Amino acid sequence: MEIQLINIGFGNIVSANRVVAIVSPESAPIKRIITDARDRGQLIDATYGRRTRAVIITDSSHVILSAIQPETVANRFVISRDHQTVDN
């Protein structure tokens, strides 16, 4: 199994294999997930002080905040998957 990485903005990269969901931060349930992760010490803020536009949830229950749109992250995720398929 090859490690796939996704750029989530500002030079920050996450492992594509660990991503469970990429969501928008506006809904109340997602805001609760962010608050709970902060309380557990499992919140990673990769926004560099900018507005949070995407919330990435991993299989290890870490929550990553990104300043780029969820659609952009998802497109990078799909492109990463497509490159692996073509290479194999």
From Swiss-Prot:
Entry-linked InterPro entries: RemA-like
Xref: Pfam families:
RemA-like (PF04025)
State the superkingdom: Bacteria
What is the similarity comment for this entry?
Answer: Belongs to the RemA family.
* Name listed for the protein in its UniProt record: Putative regulatory protein Npun_R3866
Its lineage opens with: Bacteria, Bacillati, Cyanobacteriota, Cyanophyceae, Nostocales
